[in-house]
Amino acid sequence: MRWHTEQVSEPILVIACGALAREITELKQSHGWDHMHLMCMDAWLHNEPELIADRLHRKITRHKKKYSRIFVAYADCGTGGAIDRVLEKEGVERLPGAHCYDFFAGAQRFAVLADAEPGTFYLTDFLARHFERFVIKPLRLDEQPHLRDHYFGNYRRLVFLSQTMNEELLAAARDAAKQLALDFEHVHCGYGGLESGLMAEVEKGTGG
């Protein structure tokens, strides 16, 4: 269903993790959120989460004079509450949850998955698409495959939390599980809390 925004004139700046760029762009197009301006930070920051909050703070400070409405498309993302401390100071809200797996799957479903098997490694569409760049190469598993058991010895399964029904990504996720010697499970989530979180922010500007 397309969300009509003809009555909305006030732009909203969404500062997002680069890992969500494709999904947010798709949601913007499908819902007609033409007043939503997207600015992405490097997805690689997830490998250095201690840098995320400061980078967010800089972007908010730089753009808050131009935009009266700013929303952050991050969860906590391993920052130990640092993002929330920045956002509380600036009066800005973010997506719900501790991480993207949480808001894609939904808190209740993710809790069930985590409780069923604590030793679970999760992939999203983005991570399935960029598995080599964000998992294999940073851990140097391409150079030293024997390190696999060191990093993943306590894991039992890989769960692919897909946003789209894409056979190529499904095959890539299966291959990732094989590379890590983990059982494979596919759970289709769609856009989950990413969509509902952005929708709620849009509705604030329409009086809905």
Where do the protein language model's features map onto the residues?
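Short helix-loop-beta junction
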Residues: 29-38, 177-182
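A short beta-strand-loop structural module common to alpha/beta enzyme folds
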Residues: 34-52, 186-190
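Gly/Ser/Thr-rich loops at beta-strand to alpha-helix junctions
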Residues: 15-22, 45-46, 73-83, 101-103, ...
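Long, charge-dense
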Residues: 82-134
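N-terminal basic/disordered segments at the start of proteins
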Residues: 1-32
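C-terminal, charge/polar-rich interaction regions
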Residues: 162-208
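A conserved mid-domain beta-alpha-beta active-site/ligand-binding segment of alpha/beta enzyme cores
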Residues: 115-169
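Glycine-rich, highly charged phosphate/nucleotide-binding loops
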Residues: 49-62
